[in-house]
Amino acid sequence: MSQKRLSRVIYPGTFDPITNGHLDLIERAAQMFDEVIIAVAASPSKNTLFTLEERVEFARQVTSHLDNVSAKGFSGLLVDFAKAEKANVLIRGLRTTVDFEYEFGLTNMYRRLMPGLESVFLTPAEEHAFISSTLVREVAIHGGNVDEFVPAIVANALHQKKKI
């Protein structure tokens, strides 16, 4: 039986902001797959700290050392983006059982909307398991130091946002 190689994958998220935990998963996915597309969701229902353009640019800059990684913004359904990009695999990070419950439901919905779409789940490195964009934003908004949780360019942007 021949196996089809999973060569083009999507790592979707809001990435507001992209964290060291995200970057760890991206770097690991880049070693496993031929091409990784970071799909930055517009998420109009969320009150994001950074614009879609800023979030895409952060993703591009922090992954510039990875030749097989690109970042693109999208709005609408993720499955439509996956079809347009000719990708049939999603990379998702799982930090806790709560993440698993949520992702399990999403995976089943995605399969209904796009038969053949698979999800590959990666667990974070131990040092990143507690990091979330929400927590990083909260710490930054209240004047805390987030330098160890996000890439330097993102930390600088968060420090600038505090001054506004």
Curated annotation (Swiss-Prot):
Substrate binds at residues 14, 46, 78, 92. It comes from the Bacteria. One of its GO terms (cellular component) is cytoplasm. CDD domains: PPAT. Its EC number is 2.7.7.3. ATP binds at residues 14-15, 22, 93-95, 103, 128-134. One of its GO terms (biological process) is coenzyme A biosynthetic process. Its main location: cytoplasm. It holds the Pfam family CTP_transf_like. It is an enzyme of class 2 (transferase). SUPFAM superfamilies: Nucleotidylyl transferase. InterPro entries: Cyt_trans-like (IPR004821), PPAT (IPR001980), Rossmann-like_a/b/a_fold (IPR014729). Keywords: ATP-binding, Coenzyme A biosynthesis, Cytoplasm, Magnesium, Nucleotide-binding, Nucleotidyltransferase, Transferase. One of its GO terms (molecular function) is pantetheine-phosphate adenylyltransferase activity. Its cofactor is Mg(2+). The record marks 22 as: Transition state stabilizer. It is found in: Cytoplasm. HAMAP family: PPAT_bact. This is Phosphopantetheine adenylyltransferase. The gene is coaD.
